From Swiss-Prot:
Keywords: Aminoacyl-tRNA synthetase, ATP-binding, Cytoplasm, Ligase, Nucleotide-binding, Protein biosynthesis. It comes from the Bacteria. This is Histidine--tRNA ligase. The keyword Cell membrane does not apply. InterPro entries: aa-tRNA-synth_II, aa-tRNA-synth_II/BPL/LPL, Anticodon-bd, Anticodon-bd_dom_sf, His-tRNA-ligase, HisRS-like_core, HisRS/HisZ, HisRS_anticodon. It is an enzyme of class 6 (ligase). Its EC number is 6.1.1.21. The gene is hisS. Its main location: cytoplasm. It catalyses: tRNA(His) + L-histidine + ATP = L-histidyl-tRNA(His) + AMP + diphosphate + H(+). NCBIfam families: hisS. It comes from Haemophilus influenzae (strain PittGG). One of its GO terms (molecular function) is histidine-tRNA ligase activity. Pfam families: HGTP_anticodon, tRNA-synt_His.
Length: 423
C-alpha cells in the first residue's frame, strides 16, 4: 500500500460536519457588511514580495520571520500574510480611489509561518474591511459599531471587549519611541534576546510583551497618549464621544500598538478571554500614509481584519446552539421497478420549485432500510419515499425523520405544497 500524504502542518481541512458553521458565520459577515453598503473585492493570494516589505515594515515579525516567499524566474513572490497591502495595491492599480471614497470588504486565506496552536495556524482565513478617502472619526466609529453588530448576530457580543488606543502621527510616535527607548534601556536585564532586538528595531512592539516581569516594568513606562499631537488627540476624543453616544463600551489600552508598521492614530482590537492565549478576534486601525507610501495619492484610510478560525472557535465555545442549517433538508429514497426515473423527476421538481431547500437523491442502491439509515445520517428533515405502488398511483410517501408528524401518503401534485408547510 502506498504511503498516505498528510496535510501540511498548520494547514487544516474543513470537514463536511464543520462547514455548515463556517458558512453560517461567513453569511453573517456578508449580511452585515452589505447592509452598510460595503462592496466585496477579490485579490490574488500571491503578491510581489516588496509590496509587503514596504507596507508592513521590513523589521516586523511578519516580514522578517513569517512570510512564505519563493522565486518565480527573476521575481520574488509571497503568499499574502494579510489583506490590507494587497487591497491598497489593487485600489491604486485600478484607480478605485482616485478622487473617490471606497468602502470595501474581502474574505479569504492568509499565510504565515508561525508555530501552530489553537486559534493560530499557518493557513488561516480573514474577513477584512478597508475604507479609503474618509479622514473623519465618524468612519472609525462606524467600523467599530459595524463589528459590534456582527458580534450580536453571532451571539458573542457578551464575550468580547473593545480595546482602543491612538498612536498619533508619525512625528508624535517618533517622539514617543525615543522616550520609550530611554526608559527601557535601563531594564535590558529583564529582556530576552528577541526583546533586545525589538528595542533596537521596533521598540513599540515591546509594549505587548508576554514577559510578566517586563509587563510590570511597563506599567511605569511613558504613555503614548501623553505624546499625541493635537490633531490625533482631538480625533481620538471625538471617536470616544461617538462610541459613548451609541453606548459601545470600550477600554483605553495605552499599550495597544498593533503589529504592523503602517498604522497611525486610531488602533483597536476586540479581545476575548474565552480562547486562552489567542484572545484577539478582530483588530485594525487607521493607515493614512500607506496609499501614498505604495505609490498612490495621499489618501486617508482605515480598516480591520477578523480571524474566521477564532470566530468559529468562539461561537462553538459560547454559542453552541447556533441555528446552523443542515446540509440536507429533503432526502429522496426509492426501490423497485420503474422507481428510478420517478425519483429523479421528483428530486428535480423539488429543486426547481423549492430552490431554498437542499435536496439529496439516494444514488447508491440498497433496500429501504439501508436508504433510511443514509437519510437519517444526512440530517434531513423529510424523506420522500417512492416504491412501485407509489409510481403506479402517482403518489409519494412523506416520512418525518426528526419526529413530529406521522408518515403521510400524498398525491404527487400535492407534495410541493405540503413540503412548503414543513419549512
Amino acid at each position: 500500500m502506498a504511503k498516505t500524504i498528510q496535510a501540511i502542518r498548520g494547514m487544516n481541512d474543513c470537514a463536511p460536519t464543520e462547514s455548515p458553521l463556517w458558512q453560517w458565520i461567513e453569511a453573517q459577515v456578508r449580511n452585515v457588511l452589505n447592509s452598510y453598503g460595503y462592496s466585496e473585492v477579490r485579490m490574488p493570494i500571491v503578491e510581489s514580495t516588496p509590496l509587503f516589505a514596504r507596507a508592513i515594515g521590513e523589521v516586523t515579525d511578519v516580514v522578517s520571520k513569517e512570510m512564505y516567499t519563493f522565486w518565480d524566474n527573476d521575481e520574488q513572490l509571497t503568499l499574502r500574510p494579510e489583506g490590507t497591502a494587497g487591497c491598497v495595491r489593487a485600489a491604486i492599480e485600478h484607480g478605485w480611489i482616485y478622487n473617490n471614497e471606497q468602502r470595501l470588504w474581502y474574505i479569504g486565506p492568509m499565510f504565515r509561518h508561525e508555530r501552530p496552536q489553537k486559534g493560530r495556524y499557518r493557513q488561516f482565513h480573514q474577513a477584512g474591511v478597508e475604507v479609503f478617502g474618509i479622514a473623519n472619526p465618524e468612519i472609525d466609529a462606524e467600523l467599530i459599531i459595524l463589528t459590534y453588530r456582527l458580534w450580536k448576530a453571532l451571539g458573542i457580543d457578551q464575550h468580547v471587549t473593545l480595546q482602543l488606543n491612538s498612536i498619533g502621527s508619525l512625528e508624535a510616535r517618533a517622539n514617543y519611541r525615543s522616550a520609550l527607548v530611554g526608559f527601557l534601556e535601563n531594564h535590558q536585564d529583564l529582556m530576552s534576546d528577541e526583546e533586545k532586538d525589538r528595542l533596537v528595531k521596533n521598540p513599540l512592539r515591546i509594549l505587548d510583551t508576554k514577559n510578566p516581569e517586563l509587563q510590570k516594568v511597563l506599567d511605569n513606562a511613558p504613555k503614548l497618549l501623553d505624546y499625541l499631537d493635537d490633531e490625533s488627540r482631538e480625533h481620538f476624543e471625538q471617536l470616544c464621544s461617538l462610541l459613548d453616544a451609541v453606548d459601545i463600551q470600550y477600554e483605553i489600552n495605552p499599550k495597544l500598538v498593533r503589529g504592523l508598521d503602517y498604522y497611525n492614530k486610531t488602533v483597536f482590537e476586540w479581545v476575548t478571554s474565552a480562547l486562552g492565549a489567542q484572545g484577539t478576534v478582530c483588530g485594525g486601525g487607521r493607515y493614512d500614509g500607506l496609499v501614498e507610501q505604495l505609490g498612490g495619492h495621499a489618501t486617508p484610510s482605515i480598516g480591520f481584519a477578523m480571524g474566521l478560525e477564532r470566530l468559529v472557535l468562539l461561537v462553538q465555545e459560547v454559542n453552541p446552539n447556533v441555528p446552523v442549517k443542515s446540509a440536507v433538508d429533503i432526502y429522496v429514497v426509492y426501490q423497485g421497478e420503474g422507481t428510478t426515473l420517478a425519483a429523479f423527476e421528483l428530486a428535480e421538481k423539488v429543486r426547481s420549485e423549492l430552490p431554498h431547500l437542499n435536496t439529496m437523491l439516494h444514488c447508491s442502491g440498497g433496500n429501504f432500510k439501508k436508504q433510511f439509515k443514509r437519510a437519517d445520517k444526512s440530517g434531513a428533515t423529510l424523506a420522500l419515499v417512492i416504491g412501485e405502488s407509489e409510481v403506479q398511483n402517482k403518489q409519494v410517501v412523506v416520512k418525518h425523520l426528526q419526529g413530529g408528524a406521522d408518515q403521510q401518503t400524498l398525491d404527487l401534485v400535492n407534495v410541493i405544497d405540503y413540503i412548503q408547510t414543513q419549512f
